[in-house]
């Protein structure tokens, strides 16, 4: 696999025209030149056309960190992306100049035991777009391994291609939880990841889905996108007991799998209490690094807690879902911006405000 274009390199013939959005400090983004590495034999150079803003991007902007990842030097932001190939390496046979592609943003080592087991998303040497110190993809162009670029079918837009990244989180979560036609699903959180997890669950033939959030606007969107029931809750831990009853009533039967797409004390406590004996709670969101939750009662009911980190081998299935119409991600894109300094600043401010903004997309 090629080396990719995630760090500054030497000898790019397009360096004079390649600009990127650099995170240079708290709440400070600057569009500045980004020097690309040369295209290796297994790489492609891609002109970015659609790049989405992820919650992690906003975390980095507001705090210069996300979970244990800390930005110590200026970094190009962005990792949800699709574009058009402008140059291919000499060993690349399955892609040609002009192909529209969605990019899987993580390069693993392919040598460690985890990679050999197929769990490359857990590779300790992973180089992932916009995860410090690795640069991201909110740029005019990037260089990336061809094997991580997936050709878009004719009926899938570049914006939908960029949405394969967040959708992959939901698809991987559904695989980890082994949902199917006999699985009733509860989703905690109606933000972008909660919504794509809901859409993925439906594509996996889940018969009944209840989604929970504190925000009535996001719940309304969830209902429009196909949630069977929505439940508005509070942020108060004292309300867990009464809200669990409300959620279980809304489901109307056992809750087999709960996806916690927020990752807070309250949501995890609710998930553990609401899920049936012998069910699964899948931790998708990473809101709190450390949580205090009632694990002992959950253990006594043999509720399995399943971790989810990014994704693996999901792009082909995501594209299949989009092509077939099983999943429609277009309604999730609520705001669009160009790639000027002001538009970049406005886009991140819009995304940070939340509520009415689900997915903010750059059109380059």
From Swiss-Prot:
CC per GO annotation: cytoplasm; cytosol; mitochondrial membrane; plasma membrane; plasmodesma; plastid
Stated family: Belongs to the zinc-containing alcohol dehydrogenase family.
The name this protein goes by in its record: Sorbitol dehydrogenase
Organism: Arabidopsis thaliana
Gene designation per UniProt: SDH
Tissue: Mostly expressed in dry seeds and leaves, and, to a lower extent, in roots, stems, flowers and siliques (at protein level).
Cofactor: binding details: Binds 1 zinc ion per subunit.
Topology with respect to the bilayer: Peripheral membrane protein
Amino acids binding substrate: 60, 165, 310-311
Mutant lacking the gene: phenotype: Reduced dry weight and primary root length when grown in the presence of sorbitol. Increased resistance to dehydration under short-day conditions.
Single Gene Ontology BP annotation: sorbitol metabolic process
């Amino acid at each position: 696999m090629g080396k990719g274009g995630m760090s500054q390199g030497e000898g790019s013939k397009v360096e004079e025209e390649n600009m990127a959005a650099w995170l240079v400090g708290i709440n400070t983004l600057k569009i500045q030149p980004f020097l690309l590495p040369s295209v290796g034999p297994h790489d492609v150079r891609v002109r970015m056309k659609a790049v989405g803003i992820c919650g992690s991007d906003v975390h980095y902007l507001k705090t210069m960190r996300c979970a244990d990842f800390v930005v110590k030097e200026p970094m190009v932001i962005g990792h949800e992306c699709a574009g058009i190939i402008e140059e291919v390496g000499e060993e690349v046979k399955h892609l040609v100049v002009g192909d529209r592609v969605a990019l899987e943003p993580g390069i693993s080592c392919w040598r460690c035991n985890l990679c050999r087991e197929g769990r490359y998303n857990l590779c300790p040497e992973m180089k992932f777009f916009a995860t410090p110190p690795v640069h991201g993809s909110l740029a005019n162009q990037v260089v990336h391994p061809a094997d991580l670029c997936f050709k878009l079918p004719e009926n899938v837009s570049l914006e939908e291609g960029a949405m394969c990244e967040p959708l992959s989180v939901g698809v991987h979560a559904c695989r980890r939880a082994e949902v199917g036609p006999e699985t009733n699903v509860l989703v905690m959180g109606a933000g972008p990841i909660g919504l794509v997890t809901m859409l993925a669950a439906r594509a996996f033939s889940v018969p009944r889905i209840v989604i929970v959030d504190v925000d009535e606007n996001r719940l309304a969107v969830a209902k429009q996108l196909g949630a069977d029931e929505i439940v508005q809750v509070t942020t108060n831990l004292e309300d867990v007991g009464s809200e669990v009853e409300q959620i279980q009533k809304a489901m109307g039967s056992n809750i087999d799998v709960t996806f916690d797409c927020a990752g807070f004390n309250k949501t995890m406590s609710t998930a553990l209490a609401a899920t049936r004996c012998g069910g699964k709670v899948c931790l998708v969101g990473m809101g709190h690094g450390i949580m205090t939750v009632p694990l002992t009662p959950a253990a006594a009911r043999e509720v399995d807690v399943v971790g989810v980190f990014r994704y693996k081998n999901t792009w082909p299935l995501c594209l299949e879902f989009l092509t077939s119409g099983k999943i429609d991600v277009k309604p999730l894109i609520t705001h669009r911006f160009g790639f000027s300094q002001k538009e970049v600043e406005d886009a991140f401010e819009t995304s940070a405000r939340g509520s009415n903004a689900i997915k903010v997309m750059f059109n380059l």
